[in-house]
């Protein structure tokens, strides 16, 4: 029989061994963290690091070794990360709300950027508001929105350190929890990158000390590498030979196959190229402080033991270009260098060192942050959470070694600006259908018999002419027009005097009857006032009229109507003379007119004249030497552009003088500003009953006048500042030796460069999948671009002419769907079977039939054999 104390001793030994094993289990760092996190039910911390204007295509991430070690080697790298708009404030608004630009209505860096409308409708629905209401300690540090003025603290943020207005590194103002705080130019206390890094670290440590069980959300929004590109002093000597920005598209200009600003941007001058080199160098220098900031935040997470319970996201609001396609600097283009951004994620269950090829967008950040926090994603957010793309610990069937590809989007929308509202006089029911290319429409018209004769038919207005290169063109018939009773004759009969084709001037008959006649400028003005009614007289000359030819609208200036003494008629050497001049009596119905003496030839340029018979004659060298012809044509184009700018300025001044005209004194009129002013007020309307309907038009007129005055103020301001760089319709800048205040300094003097245009409004479809990699863009001007990035990764050639009409039509339909989408269900098209497409010879229609979705009712392109593909299409 065993001693009675033996079982007790064995029991105590077993108990001690179990306690030692449990202690060893808890000593393992990973298991300890997971055990404690599950026990305490702590949600993960979230840190979003956002940079301003940071590119991927120009190699900015190559110098950030600390960030790449922390985020790329320790987390997931999304190699196909894009923004849906390459503009600061619109993109940041999309990041906050998870919506496309057309759904949060912030189209530019000025319009609706931090406006009262934005504050009321969208700022109250940012991801910070949702997380703050569920217990997160939320904090924002750095640049917010371009037009944020610091007058309030946006909702959803417990700690707020927001930068007023645009990015700066020194001499800026912060709004710290509602109190404005000015900073100077001392690096140790004022350098923005270091300041917001230190503030964010201090906030995180304090939050974990005071509220250890509450998760933290922090947004650290850096100004780098945005201008003015002021680097920290210790980095001002780095990268003297930076050349990552010199890509195949660098200084690739002009580009006649691209949209307007690209066509008129020439190669850069040497001073511009030197500026791009220094700009790239200074941008990289500013990013070194961001690199240090990432290391500081990482070390803080390690010290506090929160690294394994924190998601870190690193990205930018959009990309940048430096010298690409001849553009000295800037953003706002739909190309890869402006829409691709860095995108890294590190956190729990994220596979370290992984590359993810799925498309992620800036509108995915808000849904992802909500998903990480365990919150439901609102249905009005257009983006979707990428958390399921990161989870590496979900169980996988061991009998299926090859993972099934996740269903994800393959296309997205890139948009900039908005389409201006049409005038009331424009077409209201404009068909949403595509047109054939212009050359095809002209070719079809030239097949008709009425356009194949050389202006010989009665009432013929156009003729088809084949130029030296074999291209068919529609030319307006010169000489007197023979109206055949069409509507066009009635429309012009009120403006064109019905005289003989040899003279549109009034006959000044002497008492003797048949002499020559001449009529000076003053006489012609009197005749015009006498012959025409007041309703047809205008103070401003009519610029153009729209002439319709078989359903096609051609805008033709009235000065091109064949009238004698018209100095703007086109002329080609060797063109046949009109044979209809001798038969002019039938046109006017007034019989023949006596002959008159014609004026002498008019000298237009130093090499070209307008002869007595209204024809243009130039030196023979221009018809023989191609180089001489080009040089003279460029000279004429320059003169025309100069005169147009001068005319525009004169019209602005004329409008100003009309508004500031002094009133004439009427001694018999009772002064309105008298002591009986109140008794003189009319209780009813003073307008004539026939004039009451014009009140709405008067309001429109007042709005136009306000715009006119605004333009005039800008013009006067430019003149006062001696600003010769600004050009109408272009966004230009002047750089000089005083722009950069920190080393390295610019010493090569001032220069001017233009970076964008007012008509640079577009909507693009970007698609990446196993069979396609393209960019399809429609511009507000009607221009279309298509780039196949599989064969042209730098988008050097517009390949829209290689597409069939059916493919163009399908691309247009898909783009229109995305332009009107709302919510993640509509805004995330995906392919159900990526193996189907053009690889096996199938059509694009077969490829798209797997992406059919239910969309709101909208006008679809018609299936006409001929006609426009869509309104505004330009081949």
Swiss-Prot record:
Protein name (record):
Extracellular sulfatase Sulf-2
Alphabetized, the UniProt keywords read: Calcium, Endoplasmic reticulum, Glycoprotein, Golgi apparatus, Hydrolase, Metal-binding, Proteoglycan, Secreted, Signal
A molecular-function term among this protein's GO annotations: N-acetylglucosamine-6-sulfatase activity
- Region ranges (Disordered): 560-595
Q: How is it modified after translation?
A: Processing by furin produces a secreted form.
Task: Report the active site residues.
Answer: 88 (nucleophile)
For region Hydrophilic domain, the annotated ranges are 416-720
**Cellular localisation:** Endoplasmic reticulum; Golgi apparatus, Golgi stack; Cell surface
The organism of origin for this protein? Mus musculus
Establish whether keyword ATP-binding is in the entry: no
Q: Which family does it belong to?
A: Belongs to the sulfatase family.
Per UniProt, where does Ca(2+) bind? 52-53, 88, 317-318
Record's Pfam families? DUF3740, Sulfatase
| GO cellular component assignments | cell surface; endoplasmic reticulum; extracellular space; Golgi stack; plasma membrane
- Signal peptide residues are 1-24
Identify the cofactor(s). Answer: Ca(2+)
